[in-house]
Amino acid sequence: NLFQFRKMIKKMTKKEPVVYYAFYGCYCGKGGRGKPKDATDRCCFVHDCCYEKVTGCNPKWGYYTYSMNKQIVCGGDDPCKKQVCECDKAAAICFRDNLKTYKKKYMSFPNFFCTDPSEKC
């Protein structure tokens, strides 16, 4: 769920997720349209696509089983919740892997600037 996703992002990036990612670019946060602005925004686009493929549970609110030490390990018997966990894990790792190209100009980015045709998942 969103609270667990926040913890994963914080663990992987050492950044406060709400500040750094909740309103970043065209796809981070609620909704999304246009073309991703950079690699970090693409992480959010791919995460949105991943959530679209989830069936059988609500990705944003259902709790899943996972552990975090040096890496994130998704567990539990519920295949839907495990899939959500894997979506969140992939995005958190993607954010970490793209920290060097993170652009502050895309923080709190007004989505009315996201006018390019939207990409398909």
From Swiss-Prot:
Its cofactor is Ca(2+). GO terms for cellular component: extracellular region. It catalyses: a 1,2-diacyl-sn-glycero-3-phosphocholine + H2O = a 1-acyl-sn-glycero-3-phosphocholine + a fatty acid + H(+). Keywords: Blood coagulation cascade inhibiting toxin, Calcium, Disulfide bond, Hemostasis impairing toxin, Hydrolase, Lipid degradation, Lipid metabolism, Metal-binding, Myotoxin, Phosphoprotein, Secreted, Toxin. The keyword Repeat does not apply. GO terms for biological process: arachidonate secretion; lipid catabolic process; negative regulation of T cell proliferation; phospholipid metabolic process. Expressed by the venom gland. Its EC number is 3.1.1.4. It holds the Pfam family Phospholip_A2_1. Its main location: secreted. The active site is at H47, D88. Ca(2+) binds at Y27, G29, G31, D48. Signal peptide: none annotated. One of its GO terms (molecular function) is calcium ion binding. SUPFAM superfamilies: Phospholipase A2, PLA2 (SSF48619). InterPro entries: PLipase_A2, PLipase_A2_Asp_AS, PLipase_A2_dom, PLipase_A2_dom_sf, PLipase_A2_His_AS. The keyword Amino-acid biosynthesis does not apply. It is found in: Secreted. It is an enzyme of class 3 (hydrolase). Belongs to the phospholipase A2 family. Group I subfamily. D49 sub-subfamily. Homopentamer. Snake venom phospholipase A2 (PLA2) that displays moderate myotoxic activity in vivo, and cytotoxic activity in vitro. In vitro, shows anticoagulant activity on human plasma and in mice causes inflammatory cell infiltration and myonecrosis in the gastrocnemius muscles of CD-1 mice 3 hours after injection (100 ug). PLA2 catalyzes the calcium-dependent hydrolysis of the 2-acyl groups in 3-sn-phosphoglycerides. This is Basic phospholipase A2. It comes from Porthidium ophryomegas.
